[in-house]
């Protein structure tokens, strides 16, 4: 028997590429997570449909996230495999798409909590293996589907409590006093700029990594008064297979521990009364206990919106409704079209003028129902209002992004000259555009936690949208090694792809009533809300300055030959460096330029000018701050 776990573990990159090129197209429409209503032998443990069989909710969202296509195929999150029933008709497998196979077509019945393949049976669990069976009424055949809270796997950000203080300030998970020492308490502090101890990354294996140190993770601390259900939280050295250091986020936005799956991270005390509030690992009083609910900042709210089930605009197909729509469209556009919705994505029209024209329109005598006319008129006014605000958000983002890269060639040449790098050479460097963007937006949210996430929300959505687009179109941001002579062309191509991805997201939203409504609502959330897209009052000059500095740093890292990188050793620890030419030391620690595979092996004599002058340039660009970006930005 080939089960789900067997196939998922046997897949590799070359197989995935083959599947992409040979499979029949079936475009995924939206992502979902399927949770079994079966509680396990202890009647507590939750189980989820996973590419590694049914397990508890884990941090690696990709293995428990599925894509449902409009024709009923259920894809893995990568889009490379689909669910199918085995030839024996019992176990479920992950296989290559075959659009002619009825057993690869599934129906999700959210009313009765059932998932059915085309053979008429029902998705079931047999000793934690996924199978199909005739209807039996057991809990193992009952599933609930939902969009799980976004998990910032691989991205830096804050874990903010949903509970605000009396002044509507957000509080975040924080390492006490920003200490890099192990066994330091993890507490709650008000989210603030440049507090590196508040920034975390959820790794693919479920560890929550602190930005303070590359080996510092969230761990369970000592018991509270000897309790077996209440613990403090500490930092500790990373241990690969320690379940006490591994975490997940469930559909209630609770961060639970993999060793104690019924215990979640919360806090005791009142936010705002004390400058520091203690965090605990304990059992929430309920699924809605707000003291145990968290928001990842940035939330990447657009990711969720563009992944949801499409919701079309209200249809006007006949009678006075259709006549009203066509008349208003024609009147608003001065006779250009009788379908105004077709222009929402057009960059050459003024939607504000359309709105004024629709508002001033009066019902003609040819339309008998003034109620139908008013209904359509109000709907189109709402649509135009939403479209205007959505376009404004993306136009501002595009302006920021264009400014960031507008002098890309000049900046690249200047930096190369400063550190004696020959941009015409065939020296291979790491042209990792995604890493560069990650560094830029980490810098923004670190320096401007209130508001910076708005830019990051759009950018990260563009990156992920581009990756999905690339899977089916061989286009989008690419990550590979290039020669110095090709670096600018490579970066420019990725920049143009990124701009195109943002445009695709905007157009996707503007062509869907549900997505447009949800995005419009985000445009009016308070700026300090992690899901906000409210650009009013944002200091774009400050954001651009921070982003430009971080991008220059990322470029310098790219200009290093691929076998060299920047290492960091905290103050008080031994730094393996033999020459000051290869290092810089300040109060936080020592930064070293050395080979990726050997931190004791430094650049050869031929790169002497490169190595020494590059450190001088780093100093000029606020060295300690920038190397801090480089330390974790890759």
UniProtKB/Swiss-Prot annotation:
Location within or outside the cell: Cytoplasm; Membrane
Known function: May play an important role in stabilizing and/or regulating the cell membrane during Ca(2+) stress or certain stages of development.
Species assigned in the record: Dictyostelium discoideum
Organism phylogeny: Eukaryota, Amoebozoa, Evosea, Eumycetozoa, Dictyostelia
Keywords: Cytoplasm, Lectin, Membrane, Repeat
Domain of life: Eukaryota
Entry protein name: Calcium up-regulated protein D
Pfam family of the protein (one): Ricin_B_lectin
Residue ranges annotated for the Ricin B-type lectin domain, each copy included: 27-146, 117-250
Membrane keyword on record: yes
Family the UniProt entry places it in: Belongs to the cup family.
Keyword Membrane: yes
Induction comment from the UniProt entry of this chain: Induced by high levels of extracellular Ca(2+).
GO molecular function: carbohydrate binding
Spans annotated as Disordered: 1-23
GO cellular component, one term: nucleus
GO terms under biological process: response to cation stress
Lipid bilayer topology: Peripheral membrane protein
Major subcellular site: cytoplasm
Gene3D superfamilies, A to Z: 2.80.10.50
């Amino acid at each position: 028997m080939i089960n789900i776990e067997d196939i998922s573990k046997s897949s590799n990159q070359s197989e995935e590429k083959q599947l992409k090129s040979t499979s029949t197209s079936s475009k995924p429409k939206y992502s979902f997570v399927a949770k079994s209503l079966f509680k396990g032998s202890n009647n507590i443990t939750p189980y989820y449909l996973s590419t590694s069989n049914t397990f508890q909710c884990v941090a690696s969202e990709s293995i428990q996230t599925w894509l449902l296509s409009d024709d009923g195929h259920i894809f893995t999150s990568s889009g490379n495999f689909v669910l199918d029933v085995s030839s024996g008709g019992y176990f479920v497998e992950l296989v290559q798409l075959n659009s002619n196979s009825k057993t690869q077509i599934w129906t999700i019945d959210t009313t009765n909590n059932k998932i059915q393949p085309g053979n008429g049976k029902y998705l079931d669990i047999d000793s934690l293996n996924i199978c199909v069976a005739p209807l039996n009424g057991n809990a193992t055949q009952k599933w609930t589907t939902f969009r799980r809270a976004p998990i910032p796997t691989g991205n830096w950000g804050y874990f903010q409590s949903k509970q605000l203080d009396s002044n509507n300030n957000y509080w975040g998970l924080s390492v006490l006093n920003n200490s890099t020492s192990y066994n330091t308490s993890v507490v709650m502090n008000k989210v603030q700029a440049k507090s590196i101890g508040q920034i975390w990354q959820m790794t693919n294996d479920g560890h929550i990594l602190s930005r303070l140190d590359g080996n510092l993770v969230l761990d369970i601390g000592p018991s509270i008064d000897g309790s077996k259900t209440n613990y403090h939280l500490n930092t500790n050295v990373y241990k690969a297979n320690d379940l006490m250091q591994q975490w997940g986020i469930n559909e209630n936005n609770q961060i639970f521990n993999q060793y104690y799956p019924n215990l979640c991270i919360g806090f005791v005390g009142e936010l705002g009364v004390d400058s520091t509030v203690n965090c605990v690992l304990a059992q929430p009083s309920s699924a809605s206990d707000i003291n145990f609910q968290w928001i990842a900042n940035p939330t990447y709210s657009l990711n969720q919106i563009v992944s949801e089930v499409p919701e079309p605009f209200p249809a006007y197909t006949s009678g006075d409704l259709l006549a009203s729509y066509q008349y208003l469209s024609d009147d608003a556009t001065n006779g250009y079209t009788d379908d105004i919705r077709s222009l929402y994505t057009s960059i050459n029209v003024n939607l504000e003028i359309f709105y004024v024209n629709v508002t001033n329109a009066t019902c003609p005598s040819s339309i008998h129902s003034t109620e139908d006319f008013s209904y359509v008129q109000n709907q189109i006014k709402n649509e135009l209002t939403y479209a205007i605000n959505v376009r404004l958000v993306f136009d501002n983002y595009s302006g920021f992004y264009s400014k960031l890269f507008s002098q890309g060639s000049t900046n690249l040449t200047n930096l190369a000259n400063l550190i004696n790098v020959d941009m015409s050479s065939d020296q291979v460097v790491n042209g990792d555009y995604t890493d560069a963007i990650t560094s830029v937006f980490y810098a923004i949210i670190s320096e401007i936690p209130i508001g910076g996430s708005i830019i990051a929300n759009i950018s990260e959505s563009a990156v992920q949208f581009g990756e999905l687009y690339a899977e089916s179109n061989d286009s989008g941001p690419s990550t590979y090694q290039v020669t110095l002579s090709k670096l600018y062309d490579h970066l420019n191509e990725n920049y143009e792809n990124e701009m195109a991805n943002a445009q695709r997201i905007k157009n996707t939203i503007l062509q869907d009533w549900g997505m447009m409504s949800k995005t419009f609502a985000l445009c009016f959330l308070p700026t300090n809300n992690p899901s906000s897209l409210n650009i009013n009052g944002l200091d774009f000059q400050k954001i651009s300055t921070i982003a430009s500095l971080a991008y220059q740093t990322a470029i310098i890292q790219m200009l290093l030959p691929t076998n060299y990188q920047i290492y960091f050793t905290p103050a008080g620890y031994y730094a393996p460096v033999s020459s000051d030419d290869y290092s810089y030391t300040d109060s936080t620690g020592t930064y070293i330029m050395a080979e990726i595979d050997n931190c004791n092996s430094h650049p050869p004599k031929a790169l002497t000018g490169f190595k020494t002058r590059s450190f001088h340039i780093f100093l000029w660009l606020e060295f300690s701050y920038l190397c801090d970006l480089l330390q974790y930005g890759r």
